[in-house]
Amino acid sequence: MIIDPTRRVALYVAGQIFNKWMKVRIKRSLKEICGSFELEYIDEGRLAETLADLISPPPYFQAIKAGMPCRIALDDEKVFVGFVGKVTGKIDGDGNAITAKITGTDICGDLVNCAASPNGPAEWKNITLTQFCTMICQPFGIGVQAQTDIGAPFPVLAISPHDKAMPAMEKAARQRGVLLVSDGVANLLLTTAGSTRAPDQVAFGYNVLGTEFEDSWEKRFSDVYVKGQTAGANGNHEGVAAPMTPATTPGTGTAPASSATSAEAAGIVMTGHATDPEITRYRPDVRMVNTQSGSSTVQQQAEWHVRVDRGLGKHNAYPVKDWRAGPDAALWRPNQLTACYDPYAEIDGDMLIEGTEYHYDENGARTVLELVGPTAYDRINEPARSQKRHQARTL
């Protein structure tokens, strides 16, 4: 059954405007750098091609093909620019209707699967994060906007010939404590998590239509140790810690004493330690890192791991009314902080919108909000892998 045409959702492709859908889903998430869409409809274009002698007048719209550039607007507000990635169709037994579904990704989708610099260069000197990302994104027709401090230039930044565009940029961004996010329409954003507020709160008895929640300890730990090694006299800075000995007291963070004499050639082993007071039983974990000049300390990294693990340990999904909220009727968007009241999941405070899904179907318009703890996407200046290891890996 075809629902009445909704002028609120419009797909622009091949010089046509389509707004007659059975189902629409548009998704953006901090977990996936590019947004995606899925639309189901009666494919009048292919039906006309199949039954050309029987169809009159011409169909409402022509057939959509994979690879076509497209854009999607909600209430005439552009929210998605990208490409049709796949078209699937099914014809009924009587040959009277062809049901089709098209899916695709936004303009940043090609950054996930395509090479960063197929023809070189593979190494840059004294380049900023913004310049590096712009150099990679420019051939794809994608802009870059810095919305936060991107830090100092990299003295040397190298990638492998086979490195994909997005992983290469993310590796560099982590060294500057920056989060990469697609705006869905034109640009890759260099930003921080939760820098803006959502248009409204999320609350039972107010706008929530249901809930699913997860509160997990599976990847949370009572004690997080970060161990790294400074460069020694022999230039070794591979991040390999010296043999570990038991701490004097579990959970105290007491690190084994290091002998400057014995470690002189290989470097000094450094240990950071942070605790999560919400984890009430002994659950220790050790993370190994490189420690180099200019990067965060092992103690800062230990505290950061605890914050991120805590934020990702809470996950809630809320369908809410419509796509818009608040006095300005603004769209719900990812990477915004929102006040959340959910007595069922025992939440009463700020949460971060990890993802949004705009839906339109026989039940009308709604948004599914994916919320996580506000610290889930915190960033910290992570140390770079040594050039020595990088070069060995790319030989």
Model-flagged regions — what are they?
Residues I33, F37-L39, V84, G104, ...:
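Amphipathic, non-transmembrane alpha-helical segments in extracytoplasmic/periplasmic proteins
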Residues N19, R71-G104, V181-D183, T338-E370:
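Short beta-strand and beta-hairpin "edge-sheet" elements
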Residues I2, V79, T88-L111, A146-F221:
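Short beta-strand-centered interaction patches in the first periplasmic/extracellular domains
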